[in-house]
Amino acid sequence: DAPYGYIARTNFSFAGEVNNGAGYVRYMQEDKILMPASATKQITPSWIFKELARSFTNSLLGIDLKSGDFNRPKTSGWFVDQDFIARKSTSCSVVVQGVKVGENAELTTMWTVLGYPPASVVVPVWVKGASEQLPALLARNAGTKLSPLCDRAVTLRDRAFSYTQGMGSERYFNWELIFNKAGKG
């Protein structure tokens, strides 16, 4: 059921214990972005990947890393990964785009980002033919046993999350490597 035209989920259960689990701040940010976008019919797969899957806004803290206020020379360019929709442990982002009434259901498209979404690209996959052949970028490589696209995205993510000194250091990331005003993130 999607009374507002969309269904948003993070990683907590609506059926489980209230206030138990993670993802509440991320869910609130998703809903804050989706509600007006739904009302103005802005939601497209491209919009979802740009505005949600690659969001670096924490509404509880009132910050948006993409504002430019967290880049050099204003800061060091490093930040703590805390309750952004995109986070280090995110393994993929998927949008399923259905078909209109009367269209062939085999044309349903699964827009897929494998690996860390800010470091990956979107690849479409269709129901028709999916069982025979996935794009080579998405499919598991027989030699490495990894998806080439996911492997590359994880490598790029690890460059950004490269600080390893001390307990909790895995949460620090070089924001400048992901987003900067020069457009070279």
Which stretches of residues belong to each language-model region?
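C-terminus-biased signal that marks the final domain/tail of proteins
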Residues: D1-G185
